[in-house]
From Swiss-Prot:
<comment type="similarity">
    <text>Belongs to the universal ribosomal protein uL14 family.</text>
</comment>
<keyword id="KW-0689">Ribosomal protein</keyword>
<dbReference type="Pfam" id="PF00238">
    <property type="entry name" value="Ribosomal_L14"/>
</dbReference>
<dbReference type="InterPro" id="IPR019972">
    <property type="entry name" value="Ribosomal_uL14_CS"/>
</dbReference>
<dbReference type="GO" id="GO:0003735">
    <property type="term" value="F:structural constituent of ribosome"/>
</dbReference>
<keyword id="KW-0694">RNA-binding</keyword>
<keyword id="KW-0687">Ribonucleoprotein</keyword>
<protein>
    <recommendedName>
        <fullName>Large ribosomal subunit protein uL14</fullName>
    </recommendedName>
</protein>
<comment type="subunit">
    <text>Part of the 50S ribosomal subunit. Forms a cluster with proteins L3 and L24e, part of which may contact the 16S rRNA in 2 intersubunit bridges.</text>
</comment>
<dbReference type="InterPro" id="IPR019971">
    <property type="entry name" value="Ribosomal_uL14_arc"/>
</dbReference>
<dbReference type="GO" id="GO:0006412">
    <property type="term" value="P:translation"/>
</dbReference>
<dbReference type="GO" id="GO:0022625">
    <property type="term" value="C:cytosolic large ribosomal subunit"/>
</dbReference>
<dbReference type="InterPro" id="IPR000218">
    <property type="entry name" value="Ribosomal_uL14"/>
</dbReference>
<keyword id="KW-0699">rRNA-binding</keyword>
<dbReference type="InterPro" id="IPR036853">
    <property type="entry name" value="Ribosomal_uL14_sf"/>
</dbReference>
<comment type="function">
    <text>Binds to 23S rRNA. Forms part of two intersubunit bridges in the 70S ribosome.</text>
</comment>
<dbReference type="GO" id="GO:0070180">
    <property type="term" value="F:large ribosomal subunit rRNA binding"/>
</dbReference>
Length: 132
């Protein structure tokens, strides 16, 4: 896991619903915790692109539903600025189910993946179809 060069806003608080962008059988995820988050008093933990979050599956196949998993956020609607000055935003909030080290459980990723997430987690970058 490498550091991210862009300063990404943490736009997804706990309780946010995400689209699952892989083929593990999950369709909708809910963030219940953010791994490594150290906040200020009474602030909700929040995450952005490239963060590892703890999620529960709200919609999907019965085998994967109602369980707690790790996931990496690969897209967010809130725009962020890259060091070269370009601004990036996606049309949905999406994550990929992984293990605690950031290795994906699925074998394919649907849709675009942010370059920051692909650089930080190389296994996600190798199975991504499009990197933006």
């Amino acid at each position: 896991m490498k550091a991210i060069r862009a300063n990404i806003p943490r736009a997804l608080p706990t309780g946010a619903r995400l689209v699952c962008a892989d083929n593990t059988g999950a369709r909708e995820l809910e963030i219940i915790a953010v791994k490594g988050y150290k906040g200020v008093r009474r602030r909700y933990p929040a995450a952005g692109v490239g963060d590892i979050v703890v999620v529960t599956v709200k919609k999907g196949t019965p085998e994967i539903r109602k369980q707690v998993h790790y996931a990496v956020i690969v897209r967010q609607r809130k725009e962020y600025r890259r060091p070269d000055g370009t601004r990036v935003k996606f049309e949905d909030n999406a994550a990929v189910i992984t293990n605690e080290r950031g290795e994906p459980r699925g074998s394919e990723i649907r849709g675009a993946v942010a370059r920051e997430a692909a650089e930080r987690f190389s296994k996600i970058g190798t199975i991504a179809s499009v990197i933006v």
